[in-house]
């Protein structure tokens, strides 16, 4: 999710946040009609079944009207069964009780949640990186987002042959929208076209699969080659967001993309609220994608660092948190006395080091009674005549204030760990440095300063989890660890739409900088596609396992739950290692059915979701789903406990290999962990062997999870799985 209207609650970040807004309503008689999604599971296998006719018959039956014109909004008929309709509350209740209907839920509205990052992860340009060009060219990434700018050089088809034969999609991008042999498909689900008006969709698509484009920068900042993980792959774009991202549009995109023939789906969209799987459009669509061999990669969200803020919770999703790479952008402030301070900003304005007078917001108040609010640069409290031509100093910063008050630049206190783009030169300083500016301002008769153009700095402490990245634990399935993985989401330079100005004016740029889990999500999706180019027959769960078990381990950068596995899952994605994991944890569709039964879904609901006769005679507790990580929530603290995890691994490394287990306790952990058997001898490829992990302790810390890592090693491969045991009651943070 990026920030700037998509998993983004921040000024210039786009992340696709799923906001629950009011649903569409049409007045009819004494009851309002609202738009509802009627989900009916998989399509029946009968040759004579016509989905739309069935959907119309249902509407006629419940509406009890001679005409139902305008009632049916859309039908899902390609990859799963369902429809969207305008219903009264009583009609909704009747539909929900009908045979064959899994769930009926309101059509919510969403908003969107953004290269050095690939070099940082070892996926470098040129001959040093192993590639499988022919398979990569046959790989199709489906991008569910706000559209795309098709003319971007990142999506040029120079050197590309025709689309893969498996492609069954179309180019329905609208008027003056042209696809090519790189951008092979486009659809949109609202009036208009598939063009991107915010820059978010263009940005995410180029991160995952954009061409290598040399000499790109944001006004000279971050100059280099921008590229995706799999630049030879194809892109199909599904514009599900046009202002908001509606549930019905997302389900339509899944319905189309599955039938179109995509290999990976990246969706930097999410909700700020948690819903059960049968009412979550991303979970529903991704389940059907998984059953057809397609992995869905989803942004974790940008509502951190609160615990239990993550909403991408289904185990068949690869849920991606956001972390730093080894590059960030800074904007220095040089005070009149020569002192230099380093702040955060993506500042493309070059004032050539010229110093301008400083004015503190409080000193520019319209009146004495407004001095307090002027400290925060509240617009209605500032006298524009006292601000014009000066550098405005604010306790906090509202991006448009300094611009509208005609300041030449701005300095403000900013404790965040990410930089924003603004419409004039700014620098956000940490508290101590900001206090230095105030002290200098008060001590000088004519205080002045210069705000310098941003520059890149590189450092060795990456990766670190970012504060805005949504955290676990999982409040739907407490024994499934979320997020799964983390990837770069800080200040990512990628392609931009020429309909979208980073300054919210007419200054359009071809490449821009964004931050958020919207940016980390396509990084992970690109890695998934990269892995698939070497293992085209691997299932979604095998690809997911390879990414998770080869991840770089992460260390705590903060205290509390916000800096544990609930922040970063298995660790930071490692593209090269993920192509050769040694062992994988595979989860079949049947396993997921047993998992849903173990969650007390009744067999009728599971059957309707799966389209198969499911008796629920087999149930898997979430703790024993063959997941690459292991997590258990216990009741109470300071108790003795024993928990077990049953797992099965498949050999994808080499035949005649012996894996020995090793357990590494994390700092402060008092867990006792036993693995049985402790040695796995694999004679052949694709051989499966099972083991049990038993975890015990005499007490648990009530404020922190206890964790360890299980590592299976044959001397070449190190297959690592986090083990997390925790207590405490968690609820989703308030969205207010």
UniProtKB/Swiss-Prot annotation:
Keyword Secreted: yes
Signal peptide positions on this chain: 1-25
Enzyme Commission identifier(s): 3.4.21.-
Location (main, coarse): secreted
Keywords, in A-Z order: Autocatalytic cleavage, Glycoprotein, Hydrolase, Protease, Secreted, Serine protease, Signal, Zymogen
Active site: 145 (charge relay system), 200 (charge relay system), 518 (charge relay system)
GO biological process: proteolysis
GO molecular function: serine-type endopeptidase activity
PROSITE patterns: SUBTILASE, SUBTILASE_SER
Residues with attached carbohydrate: 176, 215, 223, 555, 602, 638, 646, 656
PANTHER family reported for this sequence: PROPROTEIN CONVERTASE SUBTILISIN/KEXIN
Protein name: Subtilisin-like protease SBT4.11
Protein encoded by which gene: SBT4.11
């Amino acid at each position: 999710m990026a920030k700037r209207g998509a998993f983004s609650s921040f000024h210039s970040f786009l992340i696709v946040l799923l906001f629950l807004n009011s649903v569409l309503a049409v007045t009819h008689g004494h009851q309002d009609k609202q738009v509802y999604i009627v989900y009916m599971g998989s399509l029946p296998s009968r040759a004579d079944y016509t989905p739309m006719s069935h959907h119309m018959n249902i509407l006629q039956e419940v509406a009890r009207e001679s005409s139902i014109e305008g009632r049916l909004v859309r039908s899902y008929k390609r990859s799963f069964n369902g429809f969207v309709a305008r219903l009264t509350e009583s009609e909704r209740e009747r539909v929900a009780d009908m045979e064959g209907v899994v769930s009926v839920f309101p059509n919510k509205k969403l908003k969107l949640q953004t290269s050095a990052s690939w070099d940082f992860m070892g996926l470098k340009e040129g001959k040093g990186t192993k590639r499988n060009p022919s398979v990569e060219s046959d790989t199709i990434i489906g991008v569910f987002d706000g559209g795309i700018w098709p003319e971007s050089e990142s999506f040029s088809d120079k050197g590309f042959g025709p689309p893969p034969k498996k492609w069954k999609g179309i180019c329905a991008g609208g008027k003056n929208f042209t696809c090519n042999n790189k951008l092979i498909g486009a659809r949109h689900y609202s009036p208009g076209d598939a063009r991107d008006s915010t820059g978010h969709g263009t940005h995410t698509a180029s991160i995952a699969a954009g061409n290598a484009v040399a000499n790109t920068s944001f006004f000279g900042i971050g100059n280099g080659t921008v590229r995706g993980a799999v630049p030879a792959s194809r892109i199909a774009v599904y514009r599900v967001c046009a202002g908001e991202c509606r549930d019905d549009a997302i389900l339509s995109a899944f319905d189309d993309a599955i039938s179109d023939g995509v290999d990976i789906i990246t969706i930097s969209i999410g909700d700020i609220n948690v819903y059960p799987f049968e009412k979550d459009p991303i979970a529903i669509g991704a389940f059907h994608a998984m059953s057809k061999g397609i992995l869905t990669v989803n942004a974790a969200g940008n509502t951190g660092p609160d615990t239990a803020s993550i909403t991408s919770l289904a185990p068949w999703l690869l849920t991606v948190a956001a972390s730093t790479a080894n590059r960030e952008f800074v904007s220095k402030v040089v005070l009149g006395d020569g002192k230099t301070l380093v702040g955060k900003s993506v500042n493309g304005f070059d004032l050539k080091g010229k110093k301008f007078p400083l004015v503190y917001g409080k000193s520019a108040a319209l009146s004495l009674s407004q001095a307090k609010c002027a400290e925060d640069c509240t617009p209605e409290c500032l006298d524009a005549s006292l601000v014009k031509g000066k550098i405005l100093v604010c306790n906090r910063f509202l991006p448009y204030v300094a611009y509208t008050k005609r300041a030449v630049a701005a300095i403000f206190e900013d404790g965040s760990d990410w930089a924003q783009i603004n419409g004039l030169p700014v620098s956000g300083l940490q508290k101590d440095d900001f206090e230095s500016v105030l002290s200098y301002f008060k001590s000088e008769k004519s205080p002045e300063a210069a705000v310098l153009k941003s520059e890149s700095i590189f450092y060795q402490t990456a990766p670190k989890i970012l504060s805005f990245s949504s955290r676990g634990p999982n409040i739907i399935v407490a024994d499934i660890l979320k997020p799964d993985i983390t990837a770069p989401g800080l200040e990512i330079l990628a392609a931009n739409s020429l309909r979208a100005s980073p300054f919210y004016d007419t200054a359009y740029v071809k490449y821009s900088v964004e931050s958020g889990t919207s940016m980390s999500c396509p990084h992970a999706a690109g890695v998934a596609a990269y892995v698939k180019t070497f293992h085209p027959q691997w299932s979604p769960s095998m690809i997911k396992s390879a990414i998770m078990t080869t991840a770089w381990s992460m260390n705590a950068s903060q205290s509390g739950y916000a800096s544990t596995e609930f922040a970063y899952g298995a660790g930071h994605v490692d593209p090269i290692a993920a192509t050769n994991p040694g062992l994988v944890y595979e989860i079949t569709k049947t396993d997921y059915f047993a998992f849903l039964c173990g969650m007390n879904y009744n067999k009728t609901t599971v059957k309707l979701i799966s389209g198969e006769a499911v008796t629920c005679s087999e149930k898997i507790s979430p703790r024993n789903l063959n997941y690459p990580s292991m997590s258990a929530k216990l009741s109470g603290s300071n108790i003795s406990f024993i928990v077990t995890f049953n797992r099965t691994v498949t050999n994808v490394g080499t035949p005649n290999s012996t894996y020995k287990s090793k357990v590494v306790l994390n700092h402060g952990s008092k867990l006792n962990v036993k693995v049985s058997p402790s040695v796995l001898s694999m004679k052949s490829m694709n051989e499966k062997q099972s083991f049990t992990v038993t975890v015990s302790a005499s007490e648990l810390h009530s404020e922190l999870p206890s964790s360890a890592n299980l590592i299976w090693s044959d001397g070449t491969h190190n297959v690592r799985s986090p083990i997390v045991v925790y207590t405490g009651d968690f609820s989703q943070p308030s969205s207010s």
